[in-house]
Amino acid sequence: MSETGIIPKSTDYTDWPADVCKYSQVFEDVLVVGTYMLDESTKLRHGKLVLYDTKEDVLKRVFDMHCDAILDFKWSPHDASVLAVAHSTGHVSFYRHQFRAELMFLRGIKVADSSVLMLSLDFSDSGKELAVSMSNGSVLIIDIDSGVIKNKWKEHDYEAWTCHYSRQDNNLLYSGGDDAALVCYDQRIPNSCIWRDIQVHHSGVVSILSRAPFGPYIATGEYGDFMHTLDTRNIGKPLFSANLGGGVWRLEHMETTENYHKVLGILMHRGAQVLRISNDFSSIDASKRIFKEHESMCYGGDWRHTDGLLATCSFYDKRVCLWEDI
């Protein structure tokens, strides 16, 4: 059966390239979009946080705020109103979504030189710590209350594109880099990793997904179009690999059922697609429908928890879309 395209329910265009989007945890029909714009004349990187009301399944822009360029953001599991943002200037910042059409700046934490890009971040389950991966190949863990760096590792030769806590054991942290390395750290063992795999991936590792229902299994994505399922107890050989036809920039967990884990795949130059990973992680089934309306570099996506309405955004065409996989 051939794949079929999906028509968007609503579309809007941001002022600057869009690279991350997530629905609010407080107002679940409000979508937050982050943007990144490099000013070629000054070489400065600018960003905006944009809020959309999607209540009627239509994108209605209700707020935007200037800031440094944004590469990633995540909601806190400790306080649903708090958003942590990774910037292009060596720092992370925190905002509160207390009112429907407004984000309020709380504080910033400087963790590196202003030339270093914060590429990815992830909260610990407690929400008390934040892991950050950076363009200089380093990965670190910040104590949020104090702003102190608790652990720092340098195991990647190039950009550390992504980092993700193990949801089976929060002492463990994974990172993926442009050097095609997948690395695991244990916070109880400072200064060195516990394993570093360069066999599984043949291009940059850009996404990692771990969830409590996964047990010891994780899913990863790479630039070179492949998604893998892995058993972290025997990391060198994938349980299953699938060519998804586009760089697997993000993997967003949607739900777990009796038979499978439902995941949204953000596939860079190919678009976005709903995926189903079998509960034993031995197979990946891609939906026969794929969202291809983004013209260039789909980098962000999320789903609305109330009804599953999907939102995605793309970089060069500055496009935000709402759509359904039905």
Curated annotation (Swiss-Prot):
> Gene3D superfamilies annotated for this entry?
YVTN repeat-like/Quinoprotein amine dehydrogenase (2.130.10.10)
Sorted alphabetically, which keywords does the UniProt record give? Answer: Cytoplasm, Hydrolase, Nucleus, Repeat, WD repeat
Gene Ontology BP terms: endocytic recycling; protein histidyl modification to diphthamide
Repeat positions for WD: 65-105, 113-152, 155-195, 293-326
Main localization is: cytoplasm
**One Gene Ontology molecular-function label:** diphthine methylesterase activity
Q: Which SMART domains match?
A: WD40
Q: What is its EC number?
A: 3.1.1.97
Output a single Gene Ontology CC term carried by this record: cytosol
From what superkingdom does this record's organism come? Eukaryota
Catalytically driven reaction(s): diphthine methyl ester-[translation elongation factor 2] + H2O = diphthine-[translation elongation factor 2] + methanol + H(+)
The record, for InterPro entries, names:
Apc4-like_WD40_dom, Diphthine_MTase, WD40/YVTN_repeat-like_dom_sf, WD40_repeat_dom_sf, WD40_rpt
The pathway this protein participates in, as annotated, is: Protein modification; peptidyl-diphthamide biosynthesis
* Protein localization: Cytoplasm; Nucleus
- What's its job? Catalyzes the demethylation of diphthine methyl ester to form diphthine, an intermediate in diphthamide biosynthesis, a post-translational modification of histidine which occurs in translation elongation factor 2 (eft201 and eft202).
What PANTHER family does the entry give? DIPHTHINE METHYLTRANSFERASE
Which protein family is named in the record? Belongs to the DPH7 family.
Q: What is this protein called?
A: Diphthine methyltransferase
Q: Which organism is the protein's source?
A: Schizosaccharomyces pombe (strain 972 / ATCC 24843)
**Source taxonomy:** Eukaryota, Fungi, Dikarya, Ascomycota, Taphrinomycotina
